[in-house]
From Swiss-Prot:
PANTHER family: ASPARTATE 1-DECARBOXYLASE. Is synthesized initially as an inactive proenzyme, which is activated by self-cleavage at a specific serine bond to produce a beta-subunit with a hydroxyl group at its C-terminus and an alpha-subunit with a pyruvoyl group at its N-terminus. It catalyses: L-aspartate + H(+) = beta-alanine + CO2. Signal peptide: none annotated. The modification Pyruvic acid (Ser) is found at residue 25. InterPro entries: Asp_de-COase-like_dom_sf, Asp_decarbox. Heterooctamer of four alpha and four beta subunits. One of its GO terms (biological process) is alanine biosynthetic process. Keywords: Autocatalytic cleavage, Cytoplasm, Decarboxylase, Lyase, Pantothenate biosynthesis, Pyruvate, Schiff base, Zymogen. This is Aspartate 1-decarboxylase. Its EC number is 4.1.1.11. One of its GO terms (cellular component) is cytosol. HAMAP family: PanD.
Length: 127
């Protein structure tokens, strides 16, 4: 049996742009993608901390070092520049892998720069 587990997360990313007229997806700074091992065209879930909206889309590489987090197409209706979002990527793991698989979590500052890398989450608050 396979289980769907969180394998990567960009925590508290700041939306830099919302582009309604772009063909769907989310554009993410390639440095951020590399930090948590998210690849282009991979499916992600986005949770908007400001309004509670949740959506799924796929990733497009953004310019390295730019800090870009841009929601494109219809998803642009669910965010505003400046909103804080959590970008989550899941993977399928076997029962044997459950206890050895560790997610990569990047906690970001207001400029989408990594301030902390985590391997596992504990209950609590990260601001």
């Amino acid at each position: 049996m396979f289980r769907t587990m969180m394998r990567a997360k960009l925590h508290r990313a700041t939306v830099t742009e919302a582009n309604l007229n772009y063909v769907g997806s989310i554009t993410i700074d390639e440095d951020l993608m590399d930090a948590v091992n998210i690849v282009e065209n991979e499916k992600v879930q986005i949770v908007n901390n400001n309004n509670g909206a949740r959506l799924e889309t796929y990733v497009i590489k953004g310019e390295r070092g730019s800090g870009v987090v841009c929601l494109n197409g219809a998803a642009a209706r669910l965010v505003q520049p400046g909103d804080k979002v959590i970008i989550i990527c899941y993977g399928l793991v076997t029962e044997e892998e459950i206890h050895t698989q560790e997610p990569k979590i990047a906690v970001l500052d207001d400029n989408n720069q990594i301030i902390e890398m985590l391997g596992a989450e504990k209950a609590g608050t990260i601001l």
